[in-house]
């Protein structure tokens, strides 16, 4: 999967189209990413009491994962781009590059 944890992404489709956020978690086996502030859902949780007596629970708002095809990585220029790979000559490892300008993508 070409989107990694820590990347800044732009949502290109869906109810949050146009929103930018940081990838909090990537789920490559499901092709989904969890983006900060995007796809917020309300989850009903049981009210529980912790050791200090504070209550938590009720209706909690949290982010839900979205499909990786609905986001684009934002490059160093602040514009959305597609991602490609090149092999680094010194280390022999794959490096992600921006298809828009050819620069390396730093996570």
Swiss-Prot record:
GO molecular function, one term: rRNA binding
Keyword Ribosomal protein among UniProt keywords: yes
Pfam families, A to Z: KOW, ribosomal_L24
Gene Ontology biological process terms from the UniProt entry: translation
Disulphide-bridged cysteine pairs: none
Protein name per its UniProtKB record: Large ribosomal subunit protein uL24
Keyword terms, alphabetized: Ribonucleoprotein, Ribosomal protein, RNA-binding, rRNA-binding
Organism of origin: Mycobacterium marinum (strain ATCC BAA-535 / M)
Chain's role: One of two assembly initiator proteins, it binds directly to the 5'-end of the 23S rRNA, where it nucleates assembly of the 50S subunit.
Record keyword Ion transport present: no
Gene name of the encoded protein: rplX
